[in-house]
């Protein structure tokens, strides 16, 4: 198993990502590019009356789900009462709309949580769901940028209307990109390897305490009671697994079930995304276009697509189909493996995604010799780091 494709990395210091990362629910069109943003719209379910309160959440250095859980804890509500339209990057100033059921706006307005800003906006008839998000607007300042190739790159992106639609590093874990590795073992139903990878696979960007604990457990696999004592408290998900293994040392499948459902599903989705990136990389390497289809392609809105493999996936024909079959064979997985019989709730039917990510309203402003501010909008599911990589290049180094 490889690390995520180098296409997902950027060798830059991002000073401020998404300071105004607003979902375009308010207006009819993007002020930057005129793109109609009314599909889907928030009205009429969002506004007026209803059992849900719609609020605006601005956060910094918080995972979206951890921020929601912290707010839920402060309100003494279950996190399932909350609705979000999408996940936002942790290491950025991000803004998004959230709903919560049964909490008056005045109560929300009085909440004070560090690095979280909560502003009530009104009532809603139902909770927010991922389908309610058109996309995001990004304002990103990059220092240490090599701007020499930027004019040509901007011209290419504008001519194509976008960039290759890679999944960004966030999909795999920015500091510890192991989710796709765990996901492969989940798909293969090798529960011990899935658990061992999640607990012990080291990445240098972690804290010294976490690295030391993982290294010790890797060398003393099976000594779970002592590992529980050594793993720091902030590794709460790892500790949930270790608590189970300390009592039931060989029950790896139920230890894995100690993780929340959304995390367990995230592993499978990350592996699907890894396969998508591999297939897309090979398509480009073979000279096949991403902005127009060739014979055998499965298309969506006139664009060629790449599969997120699953047990219902129908592979392409022609040269694209050859690539898809070769990558699956090299990985040692079959489409039917995504029907996970021992944990069926994680089964993945599969999907397809365009090979091209549309970029709207792209602008670049030089600030000094080596600093650039980019402004652009992406549909939901698009990664800003993917756009930056195409504009500024990558040597396969993690972003700070």
Swiss-Prot record:
Location of the TRUD domain: 162-357
HAMAP family recorded: TruD
Classification via Pfam families: TruD (PF01142)
Family: Belongs to the pseudouridine synthase TruD family.
Domain of life: Archaea
GO aspect biological process, one term: tRNA pseudouridine synthesis
Molecular function per GO: RNA binding; tRNA pseudouridine(13) synthase activity
Active site: 89
Chain's role: Could be responsible for synthesis of pseudouridine from uracil-13 in transfer RNAs.
Catalytic activities: uridine(13) in tRNA = pseudouridine(13) in tRNA
Protein keywords: Isomerase, tRNA processing
UniProt cross-references to SUPFAM superfamilies, sorted A to Z: Pseudouridine synthase (SSF55120)
Protein's recorded name: Probable tRNA pseudouridine synthase D
The protein's Enzyme Commission number: 5.4.99.27
Taxon lineage: Archaea, Methanobacteriati, Methanobacteriota, Methanomada group, Methanopyri
NCBIfam families: tRNA_TruD_broad
